C-alpha cells in the first residue's frame, strides 16, 4: 500500500494525475458554475432525498479526524488550485509505485482523477484525499464534487458503480474485496476527477475504471468466487474492505477514481458503463470487502481531517448546499478511501473530492446514507449500511455521532443515497441487514433506480469529497474539533467519520479514510450491481458497525488527541480489529483498522499489489487479524454485530463531545440506559413536588392514622374520619379503590388530585397528602390496594347540618357562609376551574364556622377558547342550571353560580328549592319559580339542543321574588341575580362578592353558629338519621321503607350501625310474612306493614333474640354461611324493646351489642339501639339474608305451608319458616311465639301500625315539588296501607294466614309493648326502623347518595337518603318511586292497595319481597343486593304466591315474575300507570322491588318526612 500510495502520489501517472487534476479543477470550476449543479442535481437529488450533508461542524469533525486528511485537503486545495498538479504527480508516482497494477487499474478508470484514485486506492488513498485536495486545490473542489457527483455519480452509478466494482475487483484482485468499495468510491472520485479533467480524461479514466472494474472482478474471482468476494466485500466492507480499502483502497480507490474519472469524461456512456460495471464492481467489491471497509479504521482516523475537506467541498461547491451532505459524506468516504490507500496523497488528490462523487457502492451508500441517513447519523446506531456507516463512524470520529451518521448514511443506502431519505432511514436498518437483505431491494435499485441512486451517491461523494477537501484545506485541527463537536452533536455518517479521521489528524489517515470511503462508497453504490449491492449492503452493515465502533474509538482518541491521528487510529484499529474479530473483519473499520485492513489485504493477498498507507502496527495487526478471519464468517458476524452495534450506538445528542462515540456502541448503549435510569431520579424530584410520594412509601401508610369511622361515601370510595397518630390531628381520609378500576386509577381521583394541588385557598378544602394501604410500593404489583387522599377534617357539611335540624342559621351566618363560598368559587374560576358539583353536601363546615368547598372529582379546567364540548351531565340535579338541562355543552362558570344560588335559597328555606327526580321535572320546577326559558329573557336559549324537546308544560312567569319574599331584600337581590335563567346575565362569583348582601361581610369576625359539637353532621350521618326518623315517625311507611332500605342497606348497613337494620329485618320479616298472607289479597300490603311493625315490636319486646334461634324458630332455611352469621348475631333487647314473649330472650348479649349500635333514635330503644347499633347492623344484615332466604322458601312453599300452617300453629310457624327463609335477616328468638304473636299481632297490630303509619304533616317527608300527586299518594297510601294492611290481614291467603299467625304472635308480644308500640311500635318499630333507618342512614347515608335507596336514589339524585332525597334530593326520587313503585301502590289509592295486595299477593312473598325489594328499592343501583337478598326469595314468593295468592298473585307473578311481583300486581291494580312506572322503573329485577317500590313509596313519604322542607 505505501508503495502504491507513493506511486499514486509521486509516480504512477504523475502526468495523468496532473492533467487529471487540472482537468478536474477546470471541471470543478465548470461545475461551480451553474452547469455543475445540473449534473449534480440528478446525482445530488437522490442524495438530497437522503438526510442533508453533515453540518460544517461535522465536516470539521471529520476533518480534524485526520490531520493528514486536512493536510491532504490543504494540499489538495493548494494543489488543485495551484500546487495541485505537483501533488497529484507525486501522488501519481506514489500510487504507481504503490500498486502499479492497481494504480493502472485506477488510472484506467480515471484520467486525472483516477490517478488520484490510484493514489487513493493505492496507498495514496490518503493521497487521494490529498489528491482530492489537489483536485480541490485546483479550485475545482466544490465544482469537482458537484461535477463528479453529477458525472461520477451518474457514471459512477453506472461506470462508477461498475468501475467501483471493477476497481473493487481490480483492487479486490489486488487488494481484496475492499477494492470494490474503494474502486466504487474511486470511480466516484474518478468520475469527479474525470469531470474535472477533460471529458476525454474522464473517458480514458472511465475506460481505466472499466479496466479496473474488470481487474477488480478478476481479483474478486481470484479472491475466491463472487460469494467469497461478496462475503468478503460485505465483511471487507466492514472489515476487509477496511483493510482492503487500505490495500485495494489505495489501488482500487485510485483505480476507481480513474475509472470514475474516465466514466465522468464520458458521463452518459461512462455512467452507463459505470452502472453496469459498478454493479459488477459492487458485486465483486461486495464479494471482496471493499478496501474502503478494510481501510476505514485508518481512513477514519484520517477522516478526522476529512471534515475539513467536506467543509471545503461544501463551500467550494455551489451545489454543495444540495449535495453537501452526500458530497461530504462521499467526500469523507472518498477521503477515507483515499486516505487509506495513499496517506501521502493527503487531500491533494482530486480523488478526495471525487471520492464523494465516486459512484462506489460504499461511497454511494455512504453518501446516500450520509445524506439520507443524516437522520441515521443522528441516530448514530442505525446506520443502514453497518459496513460503511458503522466502520466509518467509529474510525471516523471519536467524537462522533457524525461518524455514525456518515456510516449510517453510507451504509444505509447501498442502493442509492438519493433514492429517498425516508428510504435511507429504512435502509439504516436495511444496511445492517443489507448485506443479507440487499438483494431483493437492491435488485430493484440495481435497475435505473440503482443507477440514479449511485449517481446521487456519487454526487454526494463528490460533494463530500469537495467538502472534505475544502475542510482539509481549511484546517485539519479545526475540522477535527468541528468533527468532534459535530459528532457529539449528531452522529452524521460521513462527517462523523470525517471527524474521527480528523481527530486522527493525519493526512495519511485522511487519505486512508478517503480510500476506505471510496471503497465503501463503491461497495454501497447501488448501481454496482444487485449482488454487489446485496453483498456490499451486507458487508456495509458490519462495516458500519465496526466503523461505528472504530469511530467511537477514534472519537475517544480524537477527544484525547485530535492531533494524534495515530493514537485514534490505533485505538480505532484495536477496537475495530476486536470488533472485526468478534463480528467480522469488515467490522473493524477504524482508521488503524483500515490501514490494517489494507495491510491485511496484502497479508490476505486480497489487494497484495496495493501499497498500504502508513499504518500503525496495531492497525496492521488488526487488519491482519481481520484478514485472517473468514470473510463469510466475518460477514455474518459483522452483520449481526453491526446491527447490534449500530443499535447500541448512543444517540449523538447524548454525546457531548466524542466521549460516547469514543466509547463502544455497547458502552454508549449502557450509558444511554444509565441516562434513562437516571431520568426517574430526575422525575423523582418532580414526584417530590407531590410530598405524598416522599412521605408515602414506607413512611406514610394509612396505618399512620387511627380510623375513627365512616363519615361519607364518595364516587370512588368511602370517606373516613381519622386521627394522625404522629400529630394527633384529625383528618378525613378519602379512599380511592383500585380494585374495580379498568384504567388503573379512577380518573375522577386523578382529576381531583391534580386540581386540588393547584388550588390553595382558605375556602377550598386542603389536600394534605396521599397515603396508601401498602407499606411498599411494590405491594401494588401483587395486590391492587387503595390510595387515601388526606384532607383536613371538617366537622360538618351543610347538608348534614340542614338535615339535622340541630342548627339554626341566621342571616349573618348565611352571609358568612355565602361570602366564604363565593370567595372560594371566585378563586376557582379565576384559576379557570369549574367545580361542576356544588351542592350542600360538598360544602364543608367546621365548628369554627369556616366554609370550605370540597369534592373536586367533577371539576375541570375551563377554557373559553376551547371548542371541545363539555359534558352536561354534571352537577346534582337539584342544583343543575337550566342551560345544562337544555343540553348546553359549552357552558361557563355561571353553572357554578347557579348552584350557589340554589344553596343560598336552601340556607333560608332549610330545604332544596328545586327537588325533582328527572331533568324534565327539574326544568319544570325551575320554570315555575324562575319563569320558563324563552328567547325573550334568554336570547340564546333557542340554540340549545333540548330547547324544543324539554319545554315546560306551560309558560310560567318569573315568581322568584314572590316565592321568596321572606328572604331579606339584599339576599333576595343576590338570589335573584344568581338564579338568572340566561347564564350571560347571571352574576359571576366576583360580582356576587361585590353585591350588597356580601360586600361588607368578614367571616373571620362573625361568630360561628351554635353548631352541635357532640355530633358531626355529615351527609352520611344525616341520611342514616333520616332513615331512622322515617322508621320511627312513620311506622308503616318507615317500616316498609326501612325494611326496604334494610334489605338494601341491611346487609351493607348492618356494618354501618343500626339496630334499626335489625328491627327492619324483623319488620321486613313481618312484612314478608304479611306480604305472604296478602299475596292473594290486596289487604296483604297493610298486613305487611303491620307485620313489620309486629315483628319489630316482637323483636323489641324480646330481651335478646339470637338470629340462629330466630331462624330455627321460624324454621327458616339458611345456608351454612348465613347460619354462622346468624349465630354471631344477637338481636339486642333494645331492638326488641322489651323482653316479652319472644322465645329467645338471650338479649343480654344482644342488648349489650345493642348499646354498641346505639344509633337508633327510636324513643324506646334509642339508647339500647345506640348501644346495639353495631349489633343491629349485623342483625340487619342477617335479617336481610334471612329474609331473602325466607322469602325464597316462602315463595316455594308458601301455598302449602301457609294453608297448612293456617290450620296449625305449627303451620303458621312453618309458613313463617317458609317465609322466614326470605327473612333471614330478621333474627328473632322465640320465633314460635313470635310467629304466633306475630299472627296475633298481624291482626291486632294491623290497626296499630296503621295509626303510626298516619304521620303528621311535619313528620311526613316533604313532597317533591314536581310530583305532589305522589305525595298525596304517599299520604293516601299510608292511610290506605294502614287500612289495607287490615284488609290484607283479613284477606285469607295461605300467605295471609301465615302472616296473620305471625302478626298475632307479634300482636301478643306487642300488647305487652302496646304502650311502647303506640309510641313504641311506631317508635319501637320506629326504633327498629330507626335502627333500620339509622342503619340505612349509616349505610344509606353513605350509600344514599349512591343508590342505597334503590328506589329513592334510582329515581332522584343519589345524593340524598331516600327520604331526604325524596324530600331533599329524593323528593324527585320519591316521586319516581311514588310514580313508579309507590305510584303503582299509591296512585290507585285504595285500588292501589289492592294493587299492592296483588303485588303483595305476589308480595306476601311480596312482603318478604318488600324486604328483599326494599333492599333493591333502596339500592336502585344495587339491584344485585336486592336480588341477592330478595331476588331468589322473591322468585320463591312469586311462585308460592301465585298459587297461594290465586289470580292476583298469579297475575302479578306470572305477569311480572316474582321480581315483578310488585310490578305485576301494580299492573293489575288501578295503580297500573304508576305500576307501569314502577315496572319500568324497577325493571324485572326491581319488580319485587316494587313491593319494595311500595315501600319505596312509603320511603317516599318518609323521604318527605325526612326532607328538610317539611317540619322535620
Swiss-Prot record:
Domain Protein kinase: 705-998
SMART domains named among the record's database cross-references: S_TKc (SM00220)
Glycyl lysine isopeptide (Lys-Gly) (interchain with G-Cter in SUMO2) crosslink site(s): 519, 547
Compositional bias annotation for Basic residues: 92-109, 210-220, 418-435
Start and end residues of each stretch annotated as Disordered: 1-20, 30-60, 75-545, 566-596, 654-685, 1025-1084, 1138-1170, 1201-1231, 1245-1273, 1379-1400, 1468-1512
EC annotation from Swiss-Prot or TrEMBL: 2.7.11.22, 2.7.11.23
Compositional bias annotation for Basic and acidic residues: 189-198, 295-309, 511-522, 566-585, 660-670, 1043-1055, 1201-1210
A single GO BP: positive regulation of transcription elongation by RNA polymerase II
Phosphoserine: residues carrying this PTM: 315, 317, 325, 340, 342, 358, 360, 383, 395, 397, 400, 437, 439, 525, 1048
Compositionally skewed regions (Low complexity) per UniProt: 160-171, 246-269, 383-401, 462-489
Keywords assigned by UniProt, alphabetized: Acetylation, ATP-binding, Disease variant, Host-virus interaction, Intellectual disability, Isopeptide bond, Kinase, mRNA processing, mRNA splicing, Nucleotide-binding, Nucleus, Phosphoprotein, Serine/threonine-protein kinase, Transferase, Ubl conjugation
Compositionally biased residues, Gly residues: 129-140
GO cellular component: cyclin K-CDK13 complex; cyclin/CDK positive transcription elongation factor complex; cytosol; extracellular region; extracellular space; ficolin-1-rich granule lumen; Golgi apparatus; nuclear cyclin-dependent protein kinase holoenzyme complex
Disulfide bonds: none
Biased composition regions of type Pro residues, renumbered to the chain: 49-58, 1254-1270
Modification sites for N6-acetyllysine: 556
One GO molecular-function entry: cyclin binding
Active-site residue numbers: 837
Coiled-coil stretches noted in the UniProt entry, renumbered to this chain: none
UniProt modified residues of type Phosphothreonine: 588, 871, 1058, 1246
Location in the cell: Nucleus speckle
Primary site of residence: nucleus
Positions annotated to bind ATP: 711-719, 734
Oligomer and partners: (Microbial infection) Interacts with human herpes virus 1 (HHV-1) transcriptional regulator ICP22. Interacts with CCNL1 and CCNL2. Interacts with CCNK. Interacts with C1QBP.
Function: Cyclin-dependent kinase which displays CTD kinase activity and is required for RNA splicing. Has CTD kinase activity by hyperphosphorylating the C-terminal heptapeptide repeat domain (CTD) of the largest RNA polymerase II subunit RPB1, thereby acting as a key regulator of transcription elongation. Required for RNA splicing, probably by phosphorylating SRSF1/SF2. Required during hematopoiesis.
Protein name: Cyclin-dependent kinase 13
Species: Homo sapiens (Human)
Gene: CDK13
